[in-house]
Amino acid sequence: MISEERLLKVILAPHISEKSTVNAEKNNTVVFRVAIDATKAEVKAAVAQLFEVEVDSVRTLVNKGKTKRTGARVGRRSDWKKAYVTLAEGADIDFVGGAE
């Protein structure tokens, strides 16, 4: 079992984009920014416990940070990890929280 403290550190934020919105509508898949060292099992457990939904599958990828210039200096943005979480039929996560 994963500790409560670790579960809260795994999911950083929902990743809202045009692609993630289409995925949510068509495939019942939500996208999260997660900790770079998080495993698929940790992401699955965190989503299941924090949002009280059943998770079918988790797919992860690491986005490499871009090289950026500020004047003469060259820097690099941090790498970050994204997780596509497919929910079970009938499960839903509402990030907007609008009144029903």
Swiss-Prot record:
One of the early assembly proteins it binds 23S rRNA. One of the proteins that surrounds the polypeptide exit tunnel on the outside of the ribosome. Forms the main docking site for trigger factor binding to the ribosome. GO terms for biological process: translation. It comes from the Bacteria. Pfam families: Ribosomal_L23. The gene is rplW. Belongs to the universal ribosomal protein uL23 family. This is Large ribosomal subunit protein uL23. The keyword Cell division does not apply.
